[in-house]
Curated annotation (Swiss-Prot):
Matching SUPFAM superfamilies: Lumazine synthase (SSF52121)
Protein name: 6,7-dimethyl-8-ribityllumazine synthase 2
Similarity-based family: Belongs to the DMRL synthase family.
Lineage of the species this protein comes from: Bacteria, Pseudomonadati, Pseudomonadota, Alphaproteobacteria, Caulobacterales
Known catalytic reactions: (2S)-2-hydroxy-3-oxobutyl phosphate + 5-amino-6-(D-ribitylamino)uracil = 6,7-dimethyl-8-(1-D-ribityl)lumazine + phosphate + 2 H2O + H(+)
Enzyme class: transferase
Pfam families listed in its UniProt record: DMRL_synthase (PF00885)
Amino-acid positions noted as binding 5-amino-6-(D-ribitylamino)uracil in the UniProt annotation, renumbered to this chain: A46, L47, Q48, V76, V77, I78, F109
Segment forming the signal sequence: none
Domain of life from the UniProt record: Bacteria
Pathway named in the protein's UniProt entry: Cofactor biosynthesis; riboflavin biosynthesis; riboflavin from 2-hydroxy-3-oxobutyl phosphate and 5-amino-6-(D-ribitylamino)uracil: step 1/2
Keyword Signal part of the UniProt annotation: no
A GO CC term attached to the entry: cytosol
Gene behind the chain: ribH2
GO molecular function terms listed in the Swiss-Prot or TrEMBL record: 6,7-dimethyl-8-ribityllumazine synthase activity
Length: 154
């Protein structure tokens, strides 16, 4: 039996362009190195990512929808002077974890929650932390485990 080619959806919260570019570059390089296909949906902030992944997963079960094997969540949340940072960072992580567990979705977590922009850049750069690439690799690994443990492709 020939295994289907892996197809991922990257959902990126693009609130900090330079950092987002690096996260996306790392993720796409890792996916392409594996020979997988991917689509990208861009939203304005990290808090939207779990909702969009849930909608994409639901759409994939309709006749006209695209079925994805897994998802890569990319975004940046930088601490400010208010409680907003904690709300966005914590609820984004919680929403993604809830989706992954409840629906058994492979989701690579590449949402950076940092104190300052310099920290985000060093973690996002492909030549340094490559958190985008790490998120994509984690998703691909989880897809392999899902296929092994549950015998499921899409």
């Amino acid at each position: 039996m020939v295994e289907d080619k892996i197809r991922l959806l990257i959902v990126e919260g693009r609130s900090h362009s330079g950092i987002s570019d690096e996260l996306l570059r790392g993720a796409t390089q890792a996916i392409e190195a594996r020979g997988a296909d991917y689509d990208v949906i861009t939203v304005s902030n990290a808090l939207q990512i779990p909702t969009v992944i849930a909608m994409a997963e639901d759409a994939g079960h309709r006749p006209v929808g695209v079925r994805y094997d897994g998802y890569v969540a990319l975004g940046v949340v930088i601490r400010g002077e208010t409680y907003h940072f904690e709300l966005v960072a914590n609820e984004t992580a919680r929403g993604l974890q809830d989706l992954g567990v409840a629906k058994r979705l492979p989701i690579g977590f590449g949402v950076l929650a940092v104190d300052e922009e310099a920290q985000a850049l060093s973690r996002a750069r492909v030549s340094e932390g490559d958190r985008g690439g790490a998120a994509a690799k984690a998703c691909l690994e989880t897809i392999g485990l899902k296929r092994q443990l549950l015998g499921q492709a899409r």
